[in-house]
Amino acid sequence: MKTLCYIVLFFGATTSLAQQTLEQVLLKYNKQSIPYISAEMLIDIKNDPTIVLLDSREKKEYEVSHIKGALYAGYEDFNLQEVSKNIKSIDTPIIVYCSLGVRSEDIAETLQKAGYTNIKNLYGGIFNWKNNNLPVVNRQQKPTDSVHVYSKKWGKWLTKGIKVNNK
């Protein structure tokens, strides 16, 4: 009986360790070098014409869905000169997002190193946005429930919407 209790305790502890929170994932993969903005805060300011919203995922992810008004910035093929054409000044408010907020921190750091001073990273990325029942659009700018999940590992963080992974 004791052995059974130890086995149950061991597997219970192992399972709970495997269940990370979003905050723990972001602490693990990010340097916290760029301040976050919540989905709720972004809703309040999203229609401000001075804000530049950048999607730092790959093109195939962006084409499945993105936050309406977001400009494609990319990650592997990020081009600072191209993106800078859409940013009026170094203090323009810039919000960068990706799937969860990891790649977007990298792109935001690149923008920061280039001299931009008003950059935020969308906390939880497009997954958290969609999980909060907020709208996304496809490449035709039509509302969709589909979201590219990047990989099976990251896809577990999308709890609402249709998971797409066309790798």
Segments (PLM) and residue ranges:
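Residue-level detector of alpha-helix initiation sites
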Residues: 101-102
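Short, surface-exposed ligand- or partner-binding patches at beta-edge/loop junctions that are enriched
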Residues: 97
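N-terminal signal-anchor transmembrane helix
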Residues: 37-43
